[in-house]
Regions:
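A contiguous, well-ordered beta/alpha segment that forms the leading edge of an enzyme domain
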Residues: 1-148, 157-171
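A glycine- and small-aliphatic-rich helix-loop capping segment at beta-alpha/alpha-beta transitions
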Residues: 164, 186-189
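Single conserved hydrophobic/aromatic residue that forms the stacking wall/gate
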Residues: 190-198
Length: 198
């Protein structure tokens, strides 16, 4: 078990000379339990580095887009963007622009302003993103952006990129049983007994 700054990563590793290693880890992040299974020829230490990187990345994403964390960038924007245009970090700006575009592409069914005071379906049109200045301004008081319907999917795509960078080809990542990423071969194949093992 490895102690981290904001929680605990619990892990288990099993190695087979025939199939390689299976590494399991779990920890809490983004208000849910994260379960990770990694399979391949990497060592336990190499897999733990991957999980550490995933944990750190999820903490980073939370600090950007968790509107329930008063210290997050998004919470600060929600507080001040109706007063004057607020500068936005590159990554969060791209998230917001993507979500506003999704609202248009889904005919309003995906809406990050749905938790706003006095919400109406056209309230998102009052969210002004300025790409040149990279700022956010609310043209109506009471707007509150909530990325909860987006953030886990975004996190899984970030995890996919991390797994590729660490050359992990077989993985299963479960975020609270609601958002799942599966890559490569079924990890249970790595633990199935071989006829040669009998």
């Amino acid at each position: 078990m490895k102690q981290k700054a904001f929680g605990v990563i619990q892990s288990y590793y099993k190695h087979s000379p025939v199939y390689g290693g299976v590494f399991y880890a779990c920890f809490f992040s983004m208000h849910t339990r994260i379960d990770i299974v990694l399979c391949g020829q990497q060592s336990e230490e190499e897999f733990l580095l991957v999980v550490d990187a995933i944990y750190d990345r999820l903490c980073q994403i939370e600090k950007l887009g968790n509107c329930y964390d008063a210290d997050s960038e998004l919470a600060q924007l929600n507080q001040f963007a109706a007063i004057r245009p607020q500068p936005v970090s590159h990554e969060l700006y791209n998230m917001l622009a993507f979500c506003v575009d999704c609202n248009a592409r889904t005919n309003g069914h995906f809406d990050i302003t749905v938790h706003s005071t006095d919400y109406t379906p056209d309230l998102i049109s009052k969210v002004q993103l300025s790409p040149k200045e990279r700022t956010l301004f609310f043209q109506h008081p009471g707007i509150n952006i909530n990325l909860s319907g987006f953030l886990k999917g975004y996190a899984l795509e970030s995890i996919r990129d991390l797994l590729r960078s660490y050359e992990v080809k077989n993985a299963l990542v479960n975020m609270g049983n609601s958002s799942v990423l599966a890559l490569g071969k079924h990890c249970l194949l790595y633990t199935s007994p071989s006829p040669r093992d009998k």
